[in-house]
């Protein structure tokens, strides 16, 4: 094993952040710490993940949203201390790793179909029958 890879694994384990499993096409809510003067607050940034790149400590993802009719993209490092939490709002069904084509689309053509995970739903236990 490479020493650099080993150091990166140790650093990721030390950070011990809970990062949900998400892919391009998923709608994310990223809570970011924003410093304004002396105080810091948490700001929610919701949009579609259009790309993931890098690996290990250097991994990052790009989130795109439409704000007041203008497209806004923001790149977040996955292990950034400025990220408070990441939540997956909905899963998207896409067939590409990079969704840069969404930059040219507007309205209905920019929509992403929601993914239904049939197989994951079967893993959850069924509700117990009501005792009478």
From Swiss-Prot:
Keywords of this entry: Ribonucleoprotein, Ribosomal protein
Claim: Ribosomal protein is one of the keywords in the record: yes
InterPro entries per record: Ribosomal_bL19 (IPR001857), Ribosomal_bL19_CS (IPR018257), Ribosomal_bL19_sf (IPR038657), Translation_prot_SH3-like_sf (IPR008991)
GO MF terms held by the record: structural constituent of ribosome
Disulfide bonds: none
Pfam families the record matches: Ribosomal_L19 (PF01245)
Taxonomy, superkingdom: Bacteria
Residue stretches spanning the membrane: none
GO BP of this protein: translation
Cellular component, GO, one term: cytosolic large ribosomal subunit
NCBIfam families documented for this protein: rplS_bact (TIGR01024)
Family label: Belongs to the bacterial ribosomal protein bL19 family.
PANTHER family found in the cross-reference section: LARGE RIBOSOMAL SUBUNIT PROTEIN BL19M (PTHR15680:SF9), RIBOSOMAL PROTEIN L19 (PTHR15680)
HAMAP family (UniProt xref): Ribosomal_bL19 (MF_00402)
Function: This protein is located at the 30S-50S ribosomal subunit interface and may play a role in the structure and function of the aminoacyl-tRNA binding site.
Name of the protein: Large ribosomal subunit protein bL19
